[in-house]
């Protein structure tokens, strides 16, 4: 047996490991995602009769709901196996001895699946934000809530097919220390192309998705800055244009303040996702191209996996904090009102000068 990992064939949980952190993270993730879904429902996502009092859900909130459900499913399917391993002091391979390595492979598949699916959905959210700000006419004609509902199933289908490749012989799943985690094997003594190739392919795809998300957010930020400049230099025209297009906003076009909320929320989530994804990407490339053919960084690999799992825990809490009325009020007072006041003062000064002349 070509063992490249210290705990690859372990049957017991390594000494010195505790389930406390896993239990806390599971509880925080479960509570956070449930509360996030409640807030989404209260914000109008569950309205069945769109109208003046019940506007239809925006595409952005449909995407947020899909991401939250994905996080919740991942947390409910993965974390109980970790806690069960700690409770019985058995590794994942020994929790169901009759199944052989199947439980470990299922755990690794779920880890890779939910990691990729949530990244794809986050990219869709960033793309939606960029299109709504930079290409509003295209957005109005082609981006609808019905199409937004398809994002989560399509992302799930792609992730399902991609992450199932190890079951077809391309790639391999392995148990990591302390025996409570399984994931994609990132090193191999004989430099197997299928093992190393799938690891590099998965991490490269993740890196590409994270990069595309950052690019979309930078584009959205550039559009927001351009809109702010136009509002400063042409306040009358902006007000007139907004009044003329009021019906369009009521029929699904984003409100400026709502877009600002969405963008800040998306920026925070993207920064978090980038920070939590980079360690895994680095470890995959390091394991594939390092000179020594042995696993000398079990703790580093475990930390990278834990960083990846933190995303589904912290994301909903960011959403909960940001969607509270107190935080929104403080945010709008700190950023939106000063800009409006400054534009009003600038416009008043310009009008007085024109009347004087």
Curated annotation (Swiss-Prot):
The answer to whether keyword Transmembrane helix applies is yes
UniProt entry tagged with the keyword Disulfide bond: yes
State the UniProt keywords alphabetically: Cell membrane, Disulfide bond, G-protein coupled receptor, Glycoprotein, Membrane, Receptor, Transducer, Transmembrane, Transmembrane helix
Give the UniProt subcellular location, in the record's own words.
Answer: Cell membrane
Q: Which residues lie on this side of the membrane: Extracellular?
A: 1-20, 79-106, 171-194, 283-306
Out of the domains of life, which is the source?
Eukaryota
One GO biological process from the UniProt record?
positive regulation of cytosolic calcium ion concentration
InterPro entries attached to this UniProt entry: GPCR_Rhodpsn, GPCR_Rhodpsn_7TM, Pglndn_D_rcpt, Prostanoid_rcpt
| GO cellular component terms given for this protein | plasma membrane
State where it is primarily located. Answer: membrane
PROSITE patterns reported for this sequence: G_PROTEIN_RECEP_F1_2 (PS50262)
| Glycan attachment sites | 2, 89
Task: Summarize the protein's role.
Answer: Receptor for prostaglandin D2 (PGD2). The activity of this receptor is mainly mediated by G(s) proteins that stimulate adenylate cyclase, resulting in an elevation of intracellular cAMP. A mobilization of calcium is also observed, but without formation of inositol 1,4,5-trisphosphate.
Query: What is this protein called in UniProt?
Result: Prostaglandin D2 receptor-like
